[in-house]
From Swiss-Prot:
It comes from Paracoccidioides lutzii (strain ATCC MYA-826 / Pb01) (Paracoccidioides brasiliensis). The gene is MIC60. The chain crosses the membrane at residues 150-169. Residues 170-685 are mitochondrial intermembrane. Residues 68-99 have a biased composition (Polar residues). This is MICOS complex subunit MIC60. Component of the mitochondrial contact site and cristae organizing system (MICOS) complex. It is found in: Mitochondrion inner membrane. GO terms for biological process: cristae formation. InterPro entries: MIC60. Residues 1-42 form a transit peptide. Keywords: Coiled coil, Membrane, Mitochondrion, Mitochondrion inner membrane, Transit peptide, Transmembrane, Transmembrane helix.
Length: 685
């Protein structure tokens, strides 16, 4: 966004926005006098009774009231005159155009009795009779001042809006554009405030203490063209000198000509790189060309020695260039040095050309040395890296070879063991599954065969009865029972579709029973706890729409089907080990120490083991009853007996109780699923 300079804003702000108001009281006084002098007056008539009567409608009091109001409206001090006929003539300074002789003198009514006018210059003669009382003066109409108030408010509102616009223009560029474009003198006001703010923040900005002297730009020698010719005075002088062959000049001697030529060549050699002429020299060459062509009739050719330019050619110092783009330090140093050369070239390049050339040579040497050191360092580093890579490759190859050999041996061994175990397990499970599937298929096929036979018999019976009825009714009317035939066919189709649904339900129930049996077989025949996630997932998939089966599966702990559950034999074996440890801690109190543990361990060796079904709540009786329940296969009662223990005995049997609970949860879930499968079969039948 472009803004005008601050100097222009000063000039605009220094000039007044509106012309200066002139003095108002002179014009008001002259206007009052003009109104007074132009007012018409009437003669005073005397009535027969001796009273004076004025024929004019306005009374003297009204006239004085009007003059008083005119004097008050001007807000200036005027002479207190109560008599209108003694008014002084207008002075020349008031600027009035009326002459004193043309002013009409208004008659003055006689003053009231007992009233004198201290400022009057003359008094009227007293009448013979008292004048009638004059009517009371009309009260002046109060001025509302509505226009004055409106102008005052308008001026204040405009001033506040203008000041707010100037303030907001300093903070918003968009509003600045709008304000400076449409508001009068808006741009000047904003620039003035910006200048004031700049001067407040930077009071020393206008001082010239630290400013560098700026060298004026030399635009070349000024050429003055005379009014009568388009050529310069130098060329005109040379033409006059060349036109006079008799005068002494370079054409009079060939030696001088050769000398001038040699000097010219020497000067051109010393200049070296300066090959182009300045614009002033080219203009002089163009202007002198027609002058020399006009003197072809001379016996000797006139040649001028090249003049030295008025201002010597400015020779700049070339910047230093090094091919070190990948060295930031050298580039920074080169940039600083080139900046110094730029400053020297702008000021005095000839005086510093020697030191700058030496500095250039030193910097070039330094750059070459840095590049050489860098190349050597890179070569040595690359060699070390290559050696390290070679050694690492050898070590890695050896390590990989050894790891591959070990991995191959382990893989071969594990593969053989896995294949053998997988074949054995697959064979055993395949035999069991084949047996179960064969039995289930036989039962299902036999059941379906019986049901189909029953359905066929029933359908044949119905069909025969229907045919008989149709034949009987056909005798009466061949097409009378066509609707009944259609309904019978629809009923037949419905029955067929219903039996297909029954068959599907039976198949799903059989598959669910087989999946439950597979889970139970997996749990009973495993020697170690084995996860049964796959079998349980098959059960859940077959009974995806049954809420009871889903709830039973969800009641099983994830630890049970992820890690497996122990068999009954494993539970009994582990119970015996736990029972021995519980007997050792049976005599320990709750807060027992090392001595109590030792005493309990010793006394447990002496205690006699109970047999049968002993009664009592002691630890030995509880262990005996739990063992009996385990031998009978009643895990629920055994868990109840072990759960009744307290203290250290219950703490030691906590893990065993957790395993028993998981086993009971799984068995209970399987029983619920089997019951649900039987219930489905009953519902179908």
């Amino acid at each position: 966004m472009l803004r005008t300079s601050i100097a222009t804003s000063r000039q605009v702000l220094s000039s007044p926005v509106c012309p200066k108001a002139s003095a108002q009281w002179l014009r008001s006084s002259s206007a009052g006098r003009a109104n007074t002098t132009t007012r018409r007056h009437y003669a005073i008539l005397q009535e027969p009774n001796g009273a004076l009567r004025s024929s004019s409608s306005p009374s003297v009091a009204a006239v004085s009231d009007v003059s008083q109001r005119a004097s008050n409206s001007t807000n200036t001090k005027r002479p207190n005159t109560s008599d209108l006929n003694l008014r002084s003539a207008a002075s020349p300074s008031t600027g009035s155009t009326l002459k004193p002789e043309t002013v009409l003198v208004a008659p003055v009514s006689p003053p009231r009795q007992g009233q004198t006018s201290p400022g009057s210059a003359a008094s009227a003669p007293e009448p013979t009779a008292a004048p009638p009382p004059s009517p009371p003066p009309t009260p002046p109409t109060p001025k509302t001042g509505r226009l004055r108030r409106f102008l005052l408010y308008l001026f204040l509102t405009t001033g506040l809006a203008y000041a707010g616009g100037v303030w907001y223009s300093l903070r918003s560029d968009n509003f600045y554009d709008f304000f400076t474009e449409y508001a009068p003198y808006g741009e000047d006001a904003v620039l003035y405030l910006e200048e004031r703010d700049f001067r407040n923040r930077f009071p020393n900005a206008t001082k010239k203490n630290n400013r560098r002297a700026v060298t004026p730009i030399d635009g070349g020698a000024q050429v003055t063209i005379p009014g009568g010719s388009g050529l310069s005075w130098k060329v005109a002088e040379e033409q006059q000198e060349g036109s006079d062959i008799s005068k002494k000049g370079p054409h009079m001697s060939a030696v001088d000509k050769n000398k001038a030529t040699k000097d010219t060549k020497r000067v051109e050699k010393t200049k070296g790189g300066v090959t182009s002429k300045s614009p002033a020299q080219r203009e002089e060459a163009v202007k002198t060309k027609p002058a020399t062509e006009g003197v072809k009739t001379q016996p000797a050719k006139v040649e001028e020695t090249p003049r030295e330019p008025a201002i010597p050619a400015v020779t700049t110092i070339d910047h230093l260039v090094l091919n070190t783009e990948d060295e930031p330090v050298v580039q920074d140093l080169l940039k600083v040095f080139n900046d110094i050369i730029t400053v020297i070239s702008a000021d005095a390049p000839s005086s510093f050309s020697g030191p700058v050339a030496k500095a250039k040579e030193e910097l070039e040497k330094i750059g070459k040395r840095i590049l050489a050191l860098k190349s050597d360092a890179q070569a040595s580093a690359q060699k070390e890296i290559n050696d390290a890579h070679a050694s690492f490759d050898k070590s890695a190859a050896k390590l990989i070879r050894r790891i591959d050999e070990m991995r191959a041996e382990d893989a071969t061994k594990f593969r053989e063991e896995f294949e053998a175990e997988r074949e054995r397990i697959a064979q055993s499970y395949q035999e069991k599954i084949n047996t179960e599937l064969q039995r289930v298929h036989e039962v299902a096929e036999q059941r379906l065969r019986n049901e189909l036979v029953e359905q066929a018999i029933e359908l044949n019976r119905k069909f025969l009865s229907d045919v008989k009825n149709l034949v009987e009714h056909e005798r009466e009317s061949r097409l009378s029972k066509l609707a009944e035939l259609v309904s019978s066919v629809a009923e037949l189709e419905r029955l067929t579709a219903g039996w297909s649904d029954v068959i599907d339900i039976n198949l799903k129930t059989q598959q669910l029973q087989v999946a439950v049996d597979a889970v139970r077989t997996t749990l009973e025949n495993s020697n170690v706890p084995r996860p049964f996630i796959r079998e349980l997932a098959a059960v859940k998939k077959l009974a995806s729409n049954d809420e009871v089966v889903s709830a039973a599966i969800d009641s099983i702990s994830p630890v049970a089907y992820q890690r497996g559950i122990p068999s009954s034999a494993q539970l009994v074996d582990r119970f015996r080990r736990v029972a021995s440890e519980v007997r050792k801690a049976s005599l320990l109190p709750e807060n027992a120490g090392i001595t109590s543990h030792a005493a309990s361990f010793v006394l447990s060796k002496v205690m006699l083991k109970k047999h049968g079904s002993p009664a009592g709540n002691d630890v030995e009786s509880t262990l005996t009853r739990a063992e009996n329940f385990l031998e009978e296969g009643n895990l629920d009662e055994a868990a109840r007996e072990m759960n009744s223990l307290k203290g250290w005995a219950k703490l030691l049997s906590k893990d065993w109780l957790a395993d028993v609970r998981r086993v009971l949860e799984v068995k209970q879930a399987l029983e619920v699923i089997e019951t649900e499968a039987r219930l489905r079969c009953l519902q179908v039948e």
